[in-house]
Amino acid sequence: MNVLEQLKRLDEMPKRYKTMERSELEARARAVKERFGRRLFIPGHHYQKDEVIQFADATGDSLQLAQLAAKNSEAEYIVFCGVHFMAETADILTSDDQTVILPDLRAGCSMADMADIFQVERAWAALIERFGETIVPLVYVNSTAAIKAFVGRHGGATVTSSNAKKMMAWAFSRNERIFFLPDQHLGRNTAYALGIRLDEMAVWDPHEETLQGADDLDKVKVILWKGHCSVHENFTVRQIEHIRRMKPGIHVIVHPECSWEVVQQADYAGSTKYIIETIRNAPPGTQWAIGTEMNLVNRLKHEHPDKEIVSLNPYMCPCLTMNRIDLPHFVWALESLEQGAIVNRITVPKDIAAEAKEALDRMLSLA
């Protein structure tokens, strides 16, 4: 099977859904939700389109939604409006009699895909050879189940953008060094906030299979995987300088997946939840430039008309893979359930799920 045939198989939605009017699609979605009742749970990530998020039973970040799905024992079916690694995490945390569905299998995550399990295993072998048994692996929840399992197997834990600082401190209490993947920016920003100097960090390039950015490897405390979020890496210091010239007194708030330089220049930096709460609690009339995904920025702008809210990058596109989950695919997944056909089920092999859960549980035990 060639690549084009494989891509075609990833999107088997009947063409009729693509030509339906939005009003008909919305009516169909509401009807299925009503008929299924509590047997159906729809988590929606903050970065989802409004056309989809309106049907979410809960909105939040990836781990929060997976935990809510696991607690919702009445739900037989979980139609996850997010991306692939999020649905995987939901499958890991839910029971065997719950079914997790992703409306469009093409909804992946470029950052999660930057850490391939074979590359990670080769990197680990090289790092252990160089540094010995002095390393604790930490993995951002924005990662594949296979990488979470690897970290769980080697005594490490997952982290979120909210608890990365706490988890990094935990890892340092266990050993001398940290191997942080797949997002170098979250790792660098978190380590720096803990007092680790930039010259005490090195970047592992999985293609060159080399450590970069450190003159003295013996002083390295944090090894960062060379990965990034394609959305957040597009925010720049120049954009911050420009918005401050145009709007003196504006507050700049960014996600820690942005580069270190951007985070240092911003007024505030924190997780998606932190950004939402900061905007919600800000005084009326204040001005905000937000460095995160455009769907969320637009939603915050709509929800808080008493504040002036703009994107730090006015030319930013929404997360392309998040946007794969659209109303036609969503309705197709729901109506297929009604017809007794489960499309795009996400199932993590039991051995991988068990080790990935170890990494998740280590983090959750410290929450």
Curated annotation (Swiss-Prot):
EC code: 2.5.1.72
Residues that span the membrane, as ranges: none
Annotated binding of [4Fe-4S] cluster, by residue: 109, 229, 319
A GO CC term assigned to this protein in UniProt: cytosol
Keywords (A to Z) from UniProt: 4Fe-4S, Cytoplasm, Iron, Iron-sulfur, Metal-binding, Pyridine nucleotide biosynthesis, Transferase
Primary role: Catalyzes the condensation of iminoaspartate with dihydroxyacetone phosphate to form quinolinate.
Family per similarity comment: Belongs to the quinolinate synthase family. Type 3 subfamily.
Name the record gives this protein: Quinolinate synthase
Species in which this protein is naturally found: Geobacillus kaustophilus (strain HTA426)
Gene name, Swiss-Prot/TrEMBL: nadA
